Amino acid sequence: GGVVVLDVAGELNWNGQSVNVAGRGFRGAGAVQWPGNADANNPPDYVATLASNQHSTKAEGIAGTPRWVFNQETSVRLDNGGTWAGYAGGDTGRGAPGNAGGGGDNRNGTRDNGGGGGGGNATFGGFGAYGWKNGGWAGTFTVADFDLRGIGGAAFASPAPARVVMGGGGGAGGNNNSGADPVNSSGGAGGGVVIVRAGSMSGV
């Protein structure tokens, strides 16, 4: 993971520089392309299994690692294998496990594809987008659309010098069944951790 620790006995002069660990935390969800119109007319759900061919995948966070994750440094989706346990109850659906973002729900394979939720850390992650609609449905949103948004990851409620965590990854968005590349619907990684202890600091 992305952890940087600086322990300086004397003065730490930043000389106008900084340490950037954006995207170095828990990995985002690797989106999955369901075959044909398998993911069609499904009710909104907080959790479902990959075997059910429903909804989008959850991200990685303090509660665990799903089967499909996304390495945004290489733009590669990683499959941990069919025997990977993943999350209890399943790796897909809008529910957010721990500080990881939930996946967007898919009401229909060709429309109503909800966006994945953002990862959480100091505060909770944001909801995903309402969802993409094709031409005949463009601009029409219903109560069901609201339920399709992936839920953002929870805030880490009790950070302390001896207890910090990386930012949760973002959930995957609905990948329409038109053959779109799942990489484009995968979630981004959360932020890493920087710990600094110094006698004094300057040049910030």
Regions found by a protein language model. Give the residues of each.
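Glycine-centric low-complexity/flexibility signal
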Residues: 1-5, 9-204
